């Protein structure tokens, strides 16, 4: 019974605020359409946060944190928006965005793993750096080439966003459950010195964790730009961290 408590509380909260908003329904079909639209919009808006939260969960397992995720996603989106729209966007901007996201994530990992910079200091610095690069790329402009890219808007719709999030969770969840990687990450987070003595490649694992955050940041950039159709240098300034 306790596992149903939170969903029931959330459902009651939605019903309460729907009533307070003055929304009225003439029939049950009207209410069904309203809630279908409400949850579809909720999932689409939450897709970037869900993807980033998965990566942040892994980071927290290493006893680290990543404050740069919002700036990382914004920089990837800004660079992608600089490419001309059209079919070629899929094999120019998208692969470059993926490579950039992995590079930015690996940069965080290198600062932490190789230079022994504390995660909160390292990612605070890269948060400022990546945000500054957003302004270098964009200036004061707001670009919106994404609507002209064939099929790109589907990533911001309920079918595309939910499918992308679901596939990502299934693939990564299966990999984590079927490999030693997750156990090594947990041991690393508990005691990195003991993890080294146990033969765990601590430096490599930290690099992999922050590169994974970069990969998920790239997917978040896809869903964010597909949903909002435009990006500016100040996008996602409220996403300093996702916990």
Regions found by a protein language model. Give the residues of each.
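Hydrophobic alpha-helical transmembrane segments
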Residues: 3-8, 42, 50, 71-72, ...
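Single transmembrane alpha-helix segments in multi-pass membrane proteins
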Residues: 13-18, 34-86, 110-116, 243
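Helix-loop junctions at the membrane-solvent interface of multi-pass transporters
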Residues: 19-20, 62, 83-87, 103, ...
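Helix-loop-helix "hairpin" substructures at the membrane interface of multi-pass membrane proteins
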Residues: 89, 93-95, 103-108, 158-231
């Amino acid at each position: 019974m306790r596992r149903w408590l939170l969903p029931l509380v959330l459902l009651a909260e939605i019903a309460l605020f729907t009533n307070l908003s003055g929304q009225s329904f003439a029939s049950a079909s009207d209410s069904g359409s309203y809630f279908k639209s409400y949850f579809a919009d909720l999932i689409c808006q939450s897709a970037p946060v869900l993807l980033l939260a998965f990566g942040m969960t892994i980071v927290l397992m290493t006893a680290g944190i990543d404050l740069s995720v919002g700036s990382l996603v914004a920089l990837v989106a800004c660079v992608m928006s600089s490419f001309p729209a059209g079919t070629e966007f899929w094999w120019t901007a998208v692969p470059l965005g993926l490579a950039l996201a992995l590079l930015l994530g690996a940069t965080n990992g290198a600062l932490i793993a190789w230079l022994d910079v504390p995660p909160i200091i390292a990612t605070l610095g890269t948060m400022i750096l990546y945000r500054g690069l957003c302004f270098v790329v964009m200036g004061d402009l707001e670009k919106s080439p994404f609507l002209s890219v064939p099929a790109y808007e589907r990533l911001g719709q309920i079918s595309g966003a939910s499918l992308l999030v679901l596939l990502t969770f299934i693939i990564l969840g299966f990999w984590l459950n079927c490999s030693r990687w997750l156990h090594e990450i947990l041991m690393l987070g508990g005691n990195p010195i003991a993890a080294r003595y146990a033969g765990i490649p601590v430096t490599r694992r930290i690099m992999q964790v922050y590169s994974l955050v970069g990969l998920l940041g790239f997917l978040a950039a896809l869903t964010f730009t597909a949903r909002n159709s435009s990006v500016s240098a100040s996008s996602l300034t409220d996403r300093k961290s996702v916990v």
